[in-house]
Amino acid sequence: MAARHYIIMADIISSRYIKDGDFMGQFKNLTILANERFKSQIVSPLTITLGDEFQGIVNNAKTLFELVFFLEEQRIEAGHMFQLRYSLVHGEIETEINTKIAYEMYGPGLTHAREGLQWAKDSGHHYHVDLKPVPEAQLKLCLELYQSIKSEWKPREYKIVAAFLKHNDYKDLAKMGLYKTRSGAWKKGKSLRIDEYHTVKRLIFLILNHG
């Protein structure tokens, strides 16, 4: 009997145009880090399936978003130039779950997740979400805001952004030598919309908790 599972698929946006020859190694390392970090919450590990695409299955909707945020923040901290597009689906899988590698599984949930990834590609979106009964309209709006904040961060700012995301106190940034004064760090944090970034993440988890 088919059971419903929380599915994540992602691919690299415009991979054919990326000039960094090591981006596939970087992509693979991201999945390795995520599989290690979320070992206890992963049902079937993130597995690269089509060169520039991975899929996996996790235990709940909260983990899906924790995983997305982890991947994005790790990508920024490492200074990777590529961007990822995601499909998050709660759907049926008819075959037995492969807990070792995300291969040899079939079901309408996986089909829908792949179709969602294609929809995101065709429409220019970064996220496709279908997690019924969780209210997806609110999640989609939050993800649009989340993406709008991230899209303003330039690659040359990734080191600074990563420092802001790791350190809550502006004094820590001054100690790291990134800013001479606390006020300078505060102004940069405002321009990067770091507080708004953290707020939209909290809002997503509130929606999930009350969905």
Q: What residue spans do the PLM features occupy?
A:
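Regulatory and interdomain segments flanking nucleotide-handling catalytic cores
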Residues: 1-211
